[in-house]
């Protein structure tokens, strides 16, 4: 955020005591000084591991000066009061979906949070629990929209998704074509492309009409975005 990003994406799982916590991996081994499943530890126990110990300044644009535990999602939403958040639900858990949907409402973050998941039942659970929560398209929904961009197909009457978080390519298939971007906009949703770090690629995608870039290099991405805006 200090680099000027509008927001960030975070991955969420359930702790052993049923608290949504922010961590990508299912285990602690790769990114902390602990080991074992995230789901085997309580939120308090996860807060006491060192989640910055496996990173060096050469690997990241931010290096914490002191140990940082695995935070609760509640803490992240409450701390970053102006940031737009993409919350990806990693666990295939309807319980997690309902807890996160309720938390977004409780913290008054409906206008700045988008919830996503690769698991269709999880997204369905979010939408059923709190229809007002913004969700991104599932993989299946994105595939159908990409297919509809190839032919003249009616726009869905009431799409339940508001965003598409997609890669530029999936294998040999290019996803973010001009036709796909136009199609998504016709469905009153936005296109956010991951993970793009090269400034030239970022500016090219903005020129294509995408609405957002998800990057591991927010410093470079912000400069590329600002340079693109200044040329319009």
Model-found features: residue ranges?
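Metal-dependent phosphodiesterase/phospholipase catalytic core, i.e.
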Residues: 24-129, 157-187
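C-terminal active-site rim and adjoining tail of enzyme catalytic domains
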Residues: 146-232
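Hydrophobic packing residues within well-ordered alpha-helices of enzyme cores
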Residues: 18, 100, 123-126, 205, ...
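Hydrophobic faces of well-ordered beta-strands that scaffold small-molecule active sites
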Residues: 8-10, 85-87, 113-116, 134-137, ...
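Beta/alpha (TIM)-barrel catalytic core signal, keyed to glycine-rich beta->alpha loops juxtaposed to Asp/Glu
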Residues: 117-120, 132, 137-154
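Active-site-proximal loop/turn and secondary-structure-junction residues that shape catalytic pockets
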Residues: 14, 91-93, 121-122, 139-141, ...
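Solvent-exposed polar/charged
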Residues: 2, 6, 78-79, 128, ...
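Catalytic domains of carbohydrate-active enzymes, especially glycoside hydrolases
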Residues: 1-14, 159
